[in-house]
Amino acid sequence: MSVWAFFAFFSLFLSLSVRGSAEQCGRQAGDALCPGGLCCSFYGWCGTTVDYCGDGCQSQCDGGDGCDGGGGGGGDGDDGYLSDIIPKSTFDALLKFRNDPRCHAVGFYTYDAFISAAKEF
């Protein structure tokens, strides 16, 4: 029984002492700037929406009304060179079981969502 108590205590100690901090910018990340001119949110995350560039924005802001450039890459459905790098056929081959009915995330991983997310970097 004491082995289990030790294991439980040790696990609790590790979980409390090893905190996963993944902030990307600002005071939370040693005053690092976001790549591509993205805004750094109050909480230390990079992005282009008002959540990142609005009140509390730490760096690369334009006064809280949006961002001053960088990031995302346009709308209009034009994915530019990304579709040349990773065409839909490659995406389908990499994630060929993503629409398996046994999976909980059926339909979640789409090519368009992937391209949209990739354009943010």
Curated annotation (Swiss-Prot):
<comment type="similarity">
    <text>Belongs to the glycosyl hydrolase 19 family. Chitinase class I subfamily.</text>
</comment>
<protein>
    <recommendedName>
        <fullName>Acidic endochitinase WIN6.2C</fullName>
        <ecNumber>3.2.1.14</ecNumber>
    </recommendedName>
</protein>
<dbReference type="GO" id="GO:0008061">
    <property type="term" value="F:chitin binding"/>
</dbReference>
<keyword id="KW-1015">Disulfide bond</keyword>
<dbReference type="Pfam" id="PF00187">
    <property type="entry name" value="Chitin_bind_1"/>
</dbReference>
<keyword id="KW-0146">Chitin degradation</keyword>
<dbReference type="Pfam" id="PF00182">
    <property type="entry name" value="Glyco_hydro_19"/>
</dbReference>
<keyword id="KW-0624">Polysaccharide degradation</keyword>
<dbReference type="InterPro" id="IPR036861">
    <property type="entry name" value="Endochitinase-like_sf"/>
</dbReference>
<dbReference type="InterPro" id="IPR001002">
    <property type="entry name" value="Chitin-bd_1"/>
</dbReference>
<dbReference type="InterPro" id="IPR018371">
    <property type="entry name" value="Chitin-binding_1_CS"/>
</dbReference>
<dbReference type="GO" id="GO:0006032">
    <property type="term" value="P:chitin catabolic process"/>
</dbReference>
<keyword id="KW-0326">Glycosidase</keyword>
<feature type="disulfide bond">
    <location>
        <begin position="25"/>
        <end position="40"/>
    </location>
</feature>
<dbReference type="InterPro" id="IPR023346">
    <property type="entry name" value="Lysozyme-like_dom_sf"/>
</dbReference>
<feature type="disulfide bond">
    <location>
        <begin position="39"/>
        <end position="53"/>
    </location>
</feature>
<feature type="signal peptide">
    <location>
        <begin position="1"/>
        <end position="22"/>
    </location>
</feature>
<dbReference type="GO" id="GO:0000272">
    <property type="term" value="P:polysaccharide catabolic process"/>
</dbReference>
<dbReference type="GO" id="GO:0008843">
    <property type="term" value="F:endochitinase activity"/>
</dbReference>
<keyword id="KW-0732">Signal</keyword>
<keyword id="KW-0119">Carbohydrate metabolism</keyword>
<feature type="region of interest" description="Catalytic">
    <location>
        <begin position="78"/>
        <end position="121"/>
    </location>
</feature>
<dbReference type="GO" id="GO:0016998">
    <property type="term" value="P:cell wall macromolecule catabolic process"/>
</dbReference>
<keyword id="KW-0147">Chitin-binding</keyword>
<keyword id="KW-0611">Plant defense</keyword>
<feature type="disulfide bond">
    <location>
        <begin position="34"/>
        <end position="46"/>
    </location>
</feature>
<dbReference type="GO" id="GO:0098542">
    <property type="term" value="P:defense response to other organism"/>
</dbReference>
<dbReference type="InterPro" id="IPR000726">
    <property type="entry name" value="Glyco_hydro_19_cat"/>
</dbReference>
<keyword id="KW-0378">Hydrolase</keyword>
<feature type="disulfide bond">
    <location>
        <begin position="57"/>
        <end position="61"/>
    </location>
</feature>
<feature type="domain" description="Chitin-binding type-1">
    <location>
        <begin position="23"/>
        <end position="63"/>
    </location>
</feature>
<comment type="function">
    <text>Defense against chitin-containing fungal pathogens.</text>
</comment>
